[in-house]
Curated annotation (Swiss-Prot):
Protein name: Protein virB2
The species this protein was found in: Agrobacterium tumefaciens (strain 15955)
Record note on quaternary structure: Interacts with host plant RTNLB1 protein.
Family to which the UniProt record says this protein belongs: Belongs to the virB2 family.
Topology relative to the membrane: Multi-pass membrane protein
KW Transmembrane helix (keyword) present: yes
Length: 121
């Protein structure tokens, strides 16, 4: 127990305030630079206004078109290729195959099911 007394840190107000001042003075240049950069580079936000733009149905339709288009088809092909490679090396399980095939069915079947239920074109 005596060996720990040599390394014991005695904190009082003076040493604690000195430690805090050392930390603050070492961080001051970077904090000052960050504050100066944020003040000098501020400007109006380039966000879309709430009143203008498109309605939510158009945005959802654009997302569906993106997912069900060539991007989604590429993802489906890559998933099937990954299953084939996994199966070739003996790493594929029935759960993996069911998950990928189920995801593809849900991804491409949701649009058809939604149009069928709502009577859309």
């Amino acid at each position: 127990m005596r060996c720990f007394e040599r390394y014991r840190l005695h904190l009082n107000r003076l040493s604690l305030s000195n430690a805090m001042m050392r930390v603050i003075s070492s961080c001051a240049p970077s904090l000052g630079g960050a504050m100066a950069w944020s003040i000098s580079s501020c400007g109006p936000a380039a966000a879309q206004s709430a009143g203008g733009g498109t309605d939510p149905a158009t945005m959802v339709n654009n997302i569906c078109t993106f997912i069900l288009g060539p991007f989604g088809q590429s993802l489906a092909v890559l998933g099937i290729v990954a299953i084939g490679i996994s199966w070739m090396f003996g790493r594929a399980s029935l759960g993996l195959v069911a998950g990928v095939v189920g995801g593809i069915v849900i991804m491409f079947g949701a649009s058809f099911l939604g149009q069928t239920l709502t009577g859309g074109s």
